[in-house]
Amino acid sequence: MRTVDLRSDTLTRPTPAMREAMMTAEVGDDVFGEDPTINKLQDKIAEMTGKEAALFVTSGTQGNQVSLNAQTRPGQEVICDKNCHIFNYECGSAAMLAGVQLNALDGKNGLLNKTMIEAAIRPEDDHYPQTGLICLENTHNRGGGNIYPLDEMRCIYEFAQSQQLPVHLDGARLWNATVATGISLKEYCQYTDSVSLCFSKGLGAPVGSIVAGDKAFIQQAHLYRKAYGGGIRQGGILAAAALHAIEHQLPKLAEDHRRAKAFAEALHQMSGIHVPPETVETNIVIFEVDPKKIDAADLVRQLQVNGVLMFQFGPTRIRAVMHLHITDEDVAFALPVFRKILA
């Protein structure tokens, strides 16, 4: 039976051309800073983001956590959104590893603004934790792949500078934002002190993320990466996959966005499904299921039986994610399955 797997863009697999690039990659010992392919990737990302330096890490979680460690002190507080990845999906690492607590605000579909952040800054009082860092996520996973307006990022960053607070951007899917808007990585990252980017989601690399910032930040991030077991030796085979992805896979994200919009428009016409198509900005579609029509968990189960895999995202919410291995034919296969179940 045909299977259309829309659970996540982390399901992407290396293409034959990417595997060839990995197989022929020049490698060295990266712990000694001698892997030429990793160095090439780090230099490329530093240039693309407009930062002084970059550091290859094994995962987005590792990238975010070394960024928190490098820019905070134990006992401080980090401002973030209550639906962000750092708060929900990193195993409490901010407390476990950095010794900081998260002040998770109720953003609008995951997005914060200057007013929210300004109100969350702690007074200078011995009773309160000191605010140490602001974290944003762009695009926002639980927000449905929505994009931070560049002007809002600017307002937040300018306020943060006035408070002498660094801003970290979880940009795991920032690639999607750049493709959707035409705004470059450098333009987005000018309003951050540090940024993490992921290669193993829509870009299709098997492993790896990267953080970028000034040289002092990268020096500290390097220390924490090593402390967390992230020092790798001949990692150029992984960096080669990332370099191939940037060159060959990045433009294809536009097709994921087009399919997500078309998918949302079709779902919008179905009884029992609520998803305003205009809210779909990139490759993620999160839709509400009317519990009077069908239970969300039951819908996910019935879809799976019929060869369509999705992820339940709450009592009444389901997420579908378009990615490198999803075709127009896959979308055309999935939609009649919905109609049959909802009939």
Predicted region positions:
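Conserved PLP-enzyme active-site core in the AAT-like
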Residues: M1-E278, T282-N306, M310-I326, F333-L342
